[in-house]
Amino acid sequence: MADLSKKYCVYCLADVTSLRLRCTECQDIELCTDCFSAGAEIGNHRRWHGYQLVDGGRFTLWGPEAEGGWTSREEQLLLDAIEQFGFGNWEDMAAHVGASRTPTEVMEHYVTMYIHGNLGKACIPDSIPNRVTDHTCPTGGPLSPSLTTPLPTLDLTVADQQQLGYMPLRDDYEIEFDQEAETLISGLSVNYDDDDVEVELKEAYVDMYVRKLKERQRRKSLARDYNLVPAFLGKDKKEKEKPAKRKISKEEKELRLKLRPLYQFMSNKEIEDCFENMHKERMLRAKIRELQRYRRNGITKTEESAEYEAARHKREKRKENKNIANSKRGREDGKESEFAAIENLAGFELLSDREKVLCSSLNLSPTRYLTVKTIIIKDHLQKRQGIPSKSRLPSYLDKVLKKRILNFLTESGWISRDAS
């Protein structure tokens, strides 16, 4: 009894269940590939009629000489499986092809037909050129990956390390900043059937985790660069033994405040070196201006500058004494006294001649001058004895008056030049 599930060629009665060509103009005309290629005609069917290829998926690609009887459908599943699971994962590939194929059969068929067969010989060249270039440096060289720069050691005892939870050899803490950051990616997995939205979501999680790691490392670097760990444990006493730093000028303080947003891109040492170099630059500029002044006055040797400065101070002293003598001579000649505005005020008789000139030029009453003088000398003596004091000058004394009085007291020898 004929099998109704099979199809036969109407011309040669060959079995065409796996592959046949059906005429689109004639009814029930199906030919095998041999009869179709020979141009067979039967009944009203002609060779130029349109046709349709009917594939049952059960014909073989490699012909009758192929072992195992692999159908075209199985070949397609095999190629899909090796693309999905990768070469060598024969168990998953066999499960994808079907239960009728074992992992050994899948491996042997793929190696025989696709690698060692004609298809493999045509696609895979006999000699594959080496496209990998070794760029690693020689061992022990200046850029060798085996060389590592050790981190500066921290002066911490075992008890301090346990208290802080710090591991110096690893430069890690038992409790890191943002300790729960790893929970973002701990449950992530890459699946073959993920759509684009799921892939982008997982990439966003990874990007968030990387940013958290960078912030964690930034905070650790700040703690090390600025020596915050010993300061936290009270181990910064050695810093007090270091020589005192130079006095920072007002202009440098303002510049430090302006550049504060840039501190995060530099280490503490780099910042201090930068400002130290700027201070040296200002000192060099001042020295250059001084040397240019000497050159304009005809001085070309360093040892001559001391004599020039001494002579200049003598000239200024003689000029000041001459002005005082002229003022006294004018008063003796009956001219209007320059002290007429203050000579009748209280405390005038307590002032020296130079102090009278100063008060007259500053339009300052003798009592106010004596008050300011007393406060300044008192603060100076307390500072020399190591007693902390805060100067409380009167409100009527502005910066110009204060500077003039300080300079006068310094030149007169009441206070040292450092105090002014």
UniProtKB/Swiss-Prot annotation:
Cellular-component GO terms for this entry: nucleus; SAGA-type complex
Domain of life: Eukaryota
Keywords: Metal-binding, Nucleus, Transcription, Transcription regulation, Zinc, Zinc-finger
Zinc finger (ZZ-type): 4-59
Signal peptide: none
Predominant location category: nucleus
Residues engaged in binding Zn(2+) 2: 23, 26, 45, 49
Membrane-spanning ranges: none
Transcription found in the keyword field: yes
Chain segments carrying region Disordered: 303-333
Family annotation (Pfam families): Myb_DNA-binding (PF00249), TADA2A-like_3rd (PF22941), Tri-helical_Ada2b_C (PF24533), ZZ_ADA2 (PF25299)
Function description: Transcriptional coactivator.
Protein name in UniProt: Transcriptional adapter 2-beta
Protein source organism: Xenopus laevis (African clawed frog)
Lineage: Eukaryota, Metazoa, Chordata, Craniata, Vertebrata
